[in-house]
Amino acid sequence: MTHPITVGVDGTPESRAAAAWAGREAVRRGAPLRVTAAWHSPPHGVLDGADRDDHAQWAREMVHDIAGAVAAAHPDLSVTEKAVEGPAVDALVAEAAGARALVLGSRGHGAFVGFLLGSVGQQVIAEAGCPVVLVRADDRAAPEATGRDIVVGQQGEPDDSAAALEFAFETAAARGAGVRAVRAWSLPPVFAYSPGSLKLLDEAGGLEPYETKALADALRPWRERFPGVPVTPHVEMGSAGQVLLAQTGRAQLIVVGRRAHRSALGARIGSVAHAVIHHAPCPVAVVPHA
């Protein structure tokens, strides 16, 4: 069974852009596309039955319109549509189960402000069991930039970023693109209290050779599995979010991993994913750690 690419829509230009992007990605991967919307009426008694029926009818027509536009652009693509009643977060997280990826729209506000992601989107990213891809409205008709890489962040031990690396290499292989793997590093806090240790570290060649080897070790199994995908490793000292964002000029997609962070307020995303999804000018895929 081929897992579908699922796109969540709400009728906005951003969600139409997400649907167009999802359609192209489904064609590249040979996967079916599922177009989904959630509609949520106020509590019983606030609306009468006719108004509830209007909500449901609007959702069905909106999904049908968007699904039809994607199907017209890709006649051989299998497209299904679904409108469900319920809170958007619950519906989208449920739709993410069994999907290869869930695609959502993001609102664009210019290169300096970055794009804002609503609370629904952030909660879905934090809870979804599959990669969540965020697409801006101005990405609707733009073909994926030829010559640009799939940029992926790698951190920690090889297994820590395995899911993100797998998604990045699969996407690159489907597009005939390269992978630019980025690892950011910083000095451990101990060096602030022990200048002598820093001198010894410099004499030993510094930390960058270790970080370069760590990235090479993480990439090795994916290079072997995808020998046709060109790979450019990039190791740089600095904040992981800032180092990744500095690569956006070379990216047609940025891929970051996501660990589950739980608090009294519920699931939340980490600082690196938060920085990238709010400031990257290109589509961003947030991949849960396996």
Protein language model features and the residues they cover:
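Short beta-strand elements of ligand-binding domains
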Residues: 105-106, 132-137, 285-288
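Small/aliphatic-rich secondary-structure junction motif
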Residues: 1-49, 148-201, 223-226, 230-232, ...
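General small-molecule cofactor/ligand-binding pocket signal
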Residues: 34-36, 80-84, 133, 180-182, ...
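Short, structured interface segments
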Residues: 121-141
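Glycine-rich, Arg-bearing micro-motifs that act as flexible, cationic patches
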Residues: 104-123, 145-147, 253-278
